[in-house]
């Protein structure tokens, strides 16, 4: 009897000990630090400033105080903000799959809902190196035509003195034409008969729709903060998003129908001259049939994504690059001297020359570091509970990675706010690439939601900058410094026009 009681007593002690041991070993829930001052209902929304606030700078200042991993409550939505390359690496490697889902109001109504499948198709069929090589003539000819437009303006103004141009607008038109031709075989802006063509009204509608798209995507709506209140549409933004989508759909539908008619006329002799043709061929081969939407919706999705991906980002990067050079005249002279040494002044710069223009490549990298087109990587949500940088991130938490802050980290970059292209040649960043493998420099993002077209973007940036700097002397009016103010929005764009004086530095034959 005593033995049985003793055994029972020992068993109870062992059970209690095991239970207490397990409890002590159970990981504690650790939440990333949160700024003080959260209000009931709205949380930290009031700390982010108004519509003119540069959100990436505001979040950067918060990171200085609260650390590189931070929690925010934006309405009813929990948000995790990462502001160091270590946190970014944790997000885009170990937790890339867990943090790969988000549908904001803008994405829901304007980005379509099956972008992942279409991204795979675009990467394989549209943005491969082979396909980009086939479309190389479009990129080169549009840059040549853009340079010719500037030269023609100089001639029209007398052909003897420097003329003033708004380079920001010129770059936007040139890149838009380039992408539009690749996607739909259309040229909307500038010379070459674009403005006098039958598509003038369509071009106006398209530009208006794209501008409205970027404006709406940059707006933080009530439903983004309070998803359950989205049906109320208190601000009317969701209604406007749907209307903008319909307006763009009308034009996209017209493109597809025009291509179908052209293919009927050409019969079996048609070739896949642009992305719409490629997608129509895929549809005819049944390669889009496994998707949940019809072929037209698939094609419109891909076309819109490709156009939006480059229509604002690439011209913005070139605008910043030229602005930085104008404020650093010794560097402007250095890169023009480099081009003259490797190319001379008896021919135009070609793609094959870029590999020798090391300083020019460094200028593009340094510009992308200081002014990443997408300063905040968002549109992600935790699909499951995960741990980032030692902090618990519950399912449903939204993720923001502050690329702007990461790329100005003084622990990585010496004098991080200074324009120093040399850092990518012989300095601390000489081994950094821009394609998302080095988390200290990721202007195109990283992981599953990174930009699918960095190769095309870098080709446009390198040749576009090289051709302009080789073709023209450029300076500001009265040699004034360029205003480097940034405009609030989805991308980092220059707040003011880039008005400069240009003068040809090559012989006439190279412009005609």
Swiss-Prot record:
Subcellular location, record wording: Membrane
Membrane topology: Single-pass membrane protein
Gene Ontology terms: cellular component: membrane
Top-level class of the enzyme under EC nomenclature: oxidoreductase
Family matches, as Pfam families: p450 (PF00067)
Keywords assigned by UniProt, alphabetized: Heme, Iron, Membrane, Metal-binding, Monooxygenase, Oxidoreductase, Transmembrane, Transmembrane helix
UniProt entry tagged with the keyword Metal-binding: yes
SUPFAM superfamilies xrefs: Cytochrome P450
Cofactor: heme
GO molecular function ontology, one term from the record: iron ion binding
The protein's Enzyme Commission number: 1.14.-.-
Sites where the protein binds heme: 451
UniProt entry tagged with the keyword Flavoprotein: no
Segments crossing the lipid bilayer: 1-21
Induction: By iron deficiency.
Protein family: Belongs to the cytochrome P450 family.
PANTHER family noted in UniProt: CYTOCHROME P450 82C3-RELATED
Protein name per UniProt: Cytochrome P450 82C3
């Amino acid at each position: 009897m005593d033995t049985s009681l003793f055994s029972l007593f020992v068993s109870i002690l062992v059970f209690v000990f095991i239970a207490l041991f397990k409890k002590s070993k159970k990981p504690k829930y650790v939440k990333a630090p949160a700024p003080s001052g959260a209000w009931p209902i709205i949380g930290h929304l009031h700390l982010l400033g108004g519509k003119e606030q540069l959100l990436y700078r505001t979040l950067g200042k918060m990171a200085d105080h609260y650390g590189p991993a931070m929690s925010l409550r934006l309405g009813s939505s929990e948000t995790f903000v990462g502001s160091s390359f270590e946190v970014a690496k944790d997000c885009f490697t170990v937790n890339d799959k867990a943090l790969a889902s988000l549908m904001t109001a803008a994405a829901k109504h304007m980005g379509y809902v099956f972008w992942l499948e279409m991204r795979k198709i675009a990467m394989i069929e549209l943005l491969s190196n082979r396909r980009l090589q086939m479309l190389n003539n479009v990129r080169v000819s549009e840059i040549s035509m853009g340079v010719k437009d500037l030269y023609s303006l100089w001639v029209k103004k007398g052909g003897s003195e420097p003329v003033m141009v708004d380079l920001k607008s010129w770059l936007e038109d040139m890149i838009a034409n380039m992408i539009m031709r690749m996607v739909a075989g259309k040229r909307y802006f500038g010379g070459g008969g674009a403005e006098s063509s039958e598509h003038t009204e369509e071009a106006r509608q398209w530009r208006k729709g794209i501008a409205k798209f970027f404006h709406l995507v940059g707006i933080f709506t009530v439903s983004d903060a309070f998803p359950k209140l989205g049906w109320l549409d208190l601000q009317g933004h969701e209604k406007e998003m749907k209307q903008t989508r319909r307006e763009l759909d009308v034009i996209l539908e017209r493109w597809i129908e025009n291509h179908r008619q052209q293919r009927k006329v050409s019969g079996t002799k048609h070739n896949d001259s642009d992305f719409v043709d490629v997608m129509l061929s895929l549809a005819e081969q049944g390669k889009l049939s496994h998707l949940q939407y019809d072929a037209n919706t698939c094609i419109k999705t891909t076309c819109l994504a490709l156009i939006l991906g480059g229509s604002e980002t690439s011209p913005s990067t070139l605008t910043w690059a030229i602005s930085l050079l104008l404020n650093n005249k010794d560097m402007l002279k250095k890169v023009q001297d480099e081009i003259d040494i490797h190319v001379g002044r008896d021919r135009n710069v070609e793609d094959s020359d870029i590999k020798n223009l090391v300083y020019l490549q460094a200028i593009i990298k340094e510009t992308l570091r200081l002014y990443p087109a997408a300063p905040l990587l968002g549109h992600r949500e935790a699909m499951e509970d995960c741990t980032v940088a030692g902090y618990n991130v519950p399912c449903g938490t939204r993720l923001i990675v502050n690329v702007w802050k990461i790329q100005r980290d003084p622990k990585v970059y010496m004098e991080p706010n200074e324009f120093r292209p040399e850092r990518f040649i012989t300095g601390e960043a000489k081994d950094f690439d821009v394609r998302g493998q080095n988390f200290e420099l990721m202007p195109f993002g990283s992981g599953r939601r990174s930009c699918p077209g960095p190769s095309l973007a870098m080709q446009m940036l390198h040749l576009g900058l090289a051709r302009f700097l080789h073709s023209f002397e450029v300076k500001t009016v009265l040699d004034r410094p360029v205003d480097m103010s940034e405009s609030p929005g989805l991308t980092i764009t220059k707040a003011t026009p880039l008005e400069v004086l240009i003068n040809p530095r090559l012989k006439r034959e190279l412009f005609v």
